[in-house]
Curated annotation (Swiss-Prot):
The UniProt record lists the keyword Zinc: no
Main location: cytoplasm
Record's function text: Specifically methylates the uridine in position 2552 of 23S rRNA at the 2'-O position of the ribose in the fully assembled 50S ribosomal subunit.
Protein name: Ribosomal RNA large subunit methyltransferase E
Native source species: Methanococcus maripaludis (strain C6 / ATCC BAA-1332)
């Protein structure tokens, strides 16, 4: 075992929330993040209907089930297979949250439109700050888009985002679809982690605007880099820093697509 592996094992052994989760048979220390977020923002209530995007390994499914009780209902969606939980009112679907057929499958299972959509998903980490921030924004924007398709009016949303140049613009984007937007870092988050949680309270019912002028939405556009650089309208909308990040992300997405 290398030095790095030994440090990781030691850190985990000394991790209060890891040990607490293990003791109480929760699948992840992240379970306590949702408990703490809910304690502070009152996102999920007893009997609520909840959708968990990127639900593997199931820690947030467990936390949500503890909150909604046996009268609520929870559907999780993840690209990975999630081991079933021993509750009739918790179901995990294997699939892509951006695909309409997967969302239809989720809707067919739900007794009504969800009261809350939660997302603790993380992108594949590269270790490069700008790239990880951009990947996080892509994932969280997809989660927001899904939330606007599924949530009932007045519903709540919580999503994990990595900090970076466009973080505040993502918060602004969330505020377009919710009466209030907040940011927070629960106690269970590690101090060294770049993760922050964005909260949207009381969904206003607006459909997601694919033509939004937000630079966050522009990140999802796969037009050639040259078009992005020379577009006068785009140049007016974003700063140099945003543009640099955008171009990096487009290049990365294009190479991945190829």
């Amino acid at each position: 075992m290398g030095k790095k592996d030994k440090r990781w094992v030691l850190q985990r052994k000394n991790d209060h929330y890891y040990n607490l989760a293990k003791k109480r048979n929760y699948r992840s220390r992240a379970t306590y993040k949702l408990f703490q977020l809910n304690e502070k923002f009152n996102l999920i209530k007893e009997r609520n209907v909840v959708v968990d995007l990127g639900c593997a390994p199931g820690g947030w499914l467990q936390a949500a089930r503890d909150i909604v009780g046996d009268k609520g209902f929870i559907v999780g969606i993840d690209l990975q297979t999630v081991k079933p939980l021993p509750y009739e009112n918790v179901i995990a679907i294997k699939g892509d949250m951006t695909k309409e057929e997967i969302l239809k499958q989720a809707r067919d299972l739900l007794p009504e439109k969800p009261d809350v959509i939660i997302c603790d998903a993380s992108p594949n980490i590269s270790g490069v700050w700008d790239v990880d921030h951009a990947r996080s924004l892509e994932l969280t924007t997809m989660a927001l888009m899904t939330a606007t398709k599924m949530l009932k009016r007045g519903g709540n949303f919580v999503v994990k985002v990595f900090q970076g140049d466009l973080f505040e613009k993502y918060v602004q984007l969330v505020s377009e679809y919710f009466d209030k937007a907040f940011t927070t870092k629960p106690r269970a988050s590690r101090d060294e982690s770049a993760e922050v949680y964005v909260i949207g309270k009381r969904f206003n019912g607006r459909k997601f605007d694919l033509n939004s002028k937000s630079p966050i939405v522009k990140l999802l556009d796969l037009k050639p880099v040259e078009e992005e650089i020379t577009s006068p309208s785009l140049r007016k909308e974003i700063s140099k820093e945003d543009s640099g990040l955008m171009i990096k992300r487009i290049k990365e997405m294009r190479s991945k697509k190829e």
